[in-house]
Structure formats: structure tokens, C-alpha cells
Amino acid sequence: GDALMIISNSGRNAVPVEMALIAKARRIPVIVLTSLAHSRSVPSRHSSGKHLFDVADVVIDNCGVPGDAVLEADGSAVQICPTSTVAGAAIINMIEAEVVERLCAMGVEPPVFVSANIDGGDEFDQQWKGVLCRR
């Protein structure tokens, strides 16, 4: 079945928490990609006082630091260079690879779009547009 994946590094803001609560009320499993260290270091901004990880069925920790920045620049009082972008992209790509492998093992053609920048890419992708739009 379907699931909802919500990505929020801090996990504290009202909208992602509300999205998770609505999904749960509809019996849709919620998968969260967040920084547990960051979430646990700040108060929630949702009226329930809950963080995103509190309402998730599955929590994937991106292992980010509070504030999501890891480098200091000479002459700057703030840290720079967030890790959540790179970590999140890598985690999502690993999940995609695992899902595709499992679908193929079950004999199911995964609905994967190929790059429109390769010859035949647009034509290949047409097969999925009608299928995915109906969902």
C-alpha cells in the first residue's frame, strides 16, 4: 500500500506535524526523515507539543547536528554548510534503489522515469504518465 514520507530536518514545525497527524487519521503509514538530535534540542511549534518523530510510524535519522550546519567561516559568527541536503539525497536514493530491487524481485515493473536528456527518454516516460496520474 501507499505511505507518506515527510522530510523535515528540525521536525518541530506545525505543518509537517499536522500532515503526519492527518495521514495517521486516514490510516496512511508515515515515514519521517529528520535529525533526531536537532528535533530533540528544540521545542515543538505544533499545538500538540509533538515533534514529527513523535507521530511517525518509521523514523529515519539523518544524523544531522542541531542547526544543520557544520563549518565555520573566518569572519562569520554563524556556521555554514548544512549536512541534511546531502544526507537526505543519499538516503532517498538508497530507499529508491531498495524499493526498485524489491519490486523487480516480485516481478513488478517499477514506475521509474528516465532522464529526458537521453535519446528515447521522453518516449519511455510516456508509459508511466497515465498510470501515475490515475493514482
What are the residue ranges of the model-derived segments?
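Active-site phosphate/pyrophosphate-binding segments
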Residues: E101-R135
